[in-house]
């Protein structure tokens, strides 16, 4: 019997099954098609077989870590949400996917990873609370830098004095994109009628993050909430396909050890690497900042038997 397909993705929060755009899109597509996946919702990307999220381990043991390639593999396995689409609808899917990436993705990155208030009070807060120590000290900042580099690739190089004008232009285009999506959806349940397609999985992942997150700076969020059919569309998909998921982020300290072992066979190795990386980072910071200094000391006496016993007990704990 073939091993089950396994999906590793970011865990849920804000009332969503995942707080990550790509993870949410893949999860939603899998629900639409009924693909039999063993889902591991985690908050440590090092526990993924690829080191990134989302990632799919196929029945043959191959690891796929690009969302579009994951969906392509599910289609090859006969889980195809676009099977009944016409050629015209297939072309519309490609056009709207391109529109999402060009007009909505840059503003979504800016909203969650560049806007200072949103990043500090919402994005970094969630990841810092969700991630295990010591990853929560440095990984959110690294992720922010990666998203800022991605935004630069999407928008191109700009001088600092042009940034304010560029931001206005990006948000205006994103508002127009949302309005166009609202007009295209109309009163339908999904973009191509009564059954969801791959386009719905991606549109939902973009809109649901904007709708559900409690953003202190929500310029685009306010526009979305004025488009009532898009809001109802998100609520409908959440209630129909994710009725019991996404309420709270799991706390690393409260996760049962057996559950972690069940989810990821590399847990012990990654824990050791995480601790070593964190200790090295903290030691380096302490030395560079002068908190700790290295001085010569006279030879110390050998510790008593009692002291050795206490040290061993501390290590075992």
UniProtKB/Swiss-Prot annotation:
PTM section of the record: Ubiquitinated by PRKN during mitophagy, leading to its degradation and enhancement of mitophagy. Deubiquitinated by USP30.
Superkingdom of origin: Eukaryota
Localization per Swiss-Prot or TrEMBL: Mitochondrion outer membrane
A GO cellular component entry from the record: SAM complex
Keyword set, alphabetical order: Isopeptide bond, Membrane, Mitochondrion, Mitochondrion outer membrane, Protein transport, Transmembrane, Transmembrane helix, Transport, Ubl conjugation
N-terminal signal peptide: none
Cross-linked sites for Glycyl lysine isopeptide (Lys-Gly) (interchain with G-Cter in ubiquitin): 38, 41, 78
GO biological process, one term: protein transport
InterPro entries given in the database record: Glutathione-S-Trfase_C_sf, Glutathione_S-Trfase, Metaxin1/3, Metaxin_GST, Mito_Protein_Transport_Metaxin, Sam37/metaxin_N
Transmembrane segments: 164-184
Subunit-level organization: Interacts with MTX2/metaxin-2. Associates with the mitochondrial contact site and cristae organizing system (MICOS) complex, composed of at least MICOS10/MIC10, CHCHD3/MIC19, CHCHD6/MIC25, APOOL/MIC27, IMMT/MIC60, APOO/MIC23/MIC26 and QIL1/MIC13. This complex was also known under the names MINOS or MitOS complex. The MICOS complex associates with mitochondrial outer membrane proteins SAMM50, MTX1 and MTX2 (together described as components of the mitochondrial outer membrane sorting assembly machinery (SAM) complex) and DNAJC11, mitochondrial inner membrane protein TMEM11 and with HSPA9.
Family classification: Belongs to the metaxin family.
Function summary: Involved in transport of proteins into the mitochondrion. Essential for embryonic development.
Name of the protein this chain belongs to: Metaxin-1
Organism: Sus scrofa
Source taxonomy: Eukaryota, Metazoa, Chordata, Craniata, Vertebrata
Gene label: MTX1
């Amino acid at each position: 019997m073939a091993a089950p397909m396994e999906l590793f993705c970011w865990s849920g929060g804000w009332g969503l099954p995942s707080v990550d755009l790509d993870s949410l899109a893949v999860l939603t597509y899998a629900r639409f098609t009924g693909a039999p996946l063993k889902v591991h919702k985690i908050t440590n990307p090092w526990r993924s077989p690829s080191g990134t999220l989302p990632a799919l381990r196929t029945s043959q043991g191959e690891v796929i870590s690009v969302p579009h390639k994951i969906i392509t593999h599910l289609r090859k396995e006969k889980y195809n949400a676009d099977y009944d689409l016409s050629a015209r609808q297939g072309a519309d899917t490609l056009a709207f996917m391109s529109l999402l990436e060009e007009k909505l993705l840059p503003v979504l990155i800016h909203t969650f990873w560049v806007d200072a208030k949103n990043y500090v009070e919402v994005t970094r807060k969630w990841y810092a609370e969700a991630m295990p120590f010591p990853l929560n000290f440095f990984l959110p900042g690294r992720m922010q830098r990666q998203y800022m580099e991605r935004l630069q690739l999407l928008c191109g190089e700009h001088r600092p004095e042009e940034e304010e004008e560029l931001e206005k232009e990006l948000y205006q285009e994103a508002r127009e994109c949302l309005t166009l999506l609202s007009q295209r959806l109309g009163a339908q349940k999904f973009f191509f009628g009564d059954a969801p397609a791959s386009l719905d999985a991606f549109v939902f992942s973009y809109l649901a993050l904007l709708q559900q997150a409690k953003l202190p700076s929500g310029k685009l969020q306010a526009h979305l909430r004025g488009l009532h059919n898009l809001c109802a569309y998100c609520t409908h998909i959440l209630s129909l396909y994710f009725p019991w998921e996404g309420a709270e982020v799991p706390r690393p300290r409260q996760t049962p050890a057996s559950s972690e072992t069940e989810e990821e066979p590399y847990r012990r190795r990654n824990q050791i690497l995480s601790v070593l990386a964190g200790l090295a980072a903290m030691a380096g910071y302490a030395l560079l900042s002068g908190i700790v200094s290295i001085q010569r000391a006279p030879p110390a006496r050998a510790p008593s038997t009692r002291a050795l016993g206490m040290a061993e007990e501390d290590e075992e704990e």
